Swiss-Prot record:
This is NADH-quinone oxidoreductase subunit I. Residues 53-83, 93-122 form the 4Fe-4S ferredoxin-type domain. Gene3D superfamilies: 3.30.70.3270. It comes from Bordetella avium (strain 197N). Pfam families: Fer4_7. GO terms for biological process: aerobic respiration. It is a peripheral membrane protein. NDH-1 is composed of 14 different subunits. Subunits NuoA, H, J, K, L, M, N constitute the membrane sector of the complex. Keywords: 4Fe-4S, Cell inner membrane, Cell membrane, Iron, Iron-sulfur, Membrane, Metal-binding, NAD, Quinone, Repeat, Translocase, Ubiquinone. The gene is nuoI. GO terms for molecular function: 4 iron, 4 sulfur cluster binding; iron ion binding; NADH:ubiquinone reductase (non-electrogenic) activity; quinone binding.
Length: 162
């Protein structure tokens, strides 16, 4: 009985019509695919992307070399070296982040008592060599200087939720 049913099913092309019905169902729906470089999905305001080091308005870097971010980093991606100044304060001489190790968890940003290290909204960066994804203190300060207005605005918007 099953063989006869299969014979008439294939003779009447029911499998073809079932497939065409499924194709037609999705053919007229709105497309979900975006053409990436020209079209982008909106990112969350809390998106964690490329790191940046911030400065105070007078131009002095915020980092006080407390090394909390280095201690809390689960991937051990942050390396900090510091020196004592003549006035008794500590400042970093070396602040490196290896983005090949970083898991973008945001613990460094949360642990910083002076809001020095932040994660920006930038997610489009690349490197041709492994060393290109190793960010030094000067590179992180340059990112912070370039996007300071945007960083300050996003942190002000997010302040009620902290």
């Amino acid at each position: 009985m099953e063989a006869i049913k299969d014979f008439f099913g294939s003779l009447l092309l029911t499998e073809l019509f079932k497939g065409m019905r499924l194709t037609g169902k999705y053919f007229f729906k709105r497309k979900m695919t975006l053409r990436y470089p020209t079209e982008k999905t909106p990112a969350s305001p809390r998106f964690r992307g490329l790191h940046a080091l911030r400065r105070y308005p007078n131009g002095e870097e915020r980092c006080i070399a407390c090394k909390l971010c280095e201690a809390v980093c689960p991937a051990l991606a942050i390396t900090i070296e510091s020196d004592q100044r003549e006035d008794g304060t500590r400042r970093t001489t070396r602040y490196d982040i290896d983005l090949t190790k970083c898991i973008f968890c945001g613990f460094c940003e949360e642990s910083c008592p002076v809001d020095s290290i932040v994660e920006t909204h930038i997610h489009e960066y690349h490197g041709e060599k492994r060393g290109d994804l190793y960010f030094t203190k000067d590179m992180l300060l340059a990112v912070g200087d370039r996007y300071e207005a945007d960083i300050a605005q996003r942190r002000a918007e997010d302040a009620p939720y902290r």
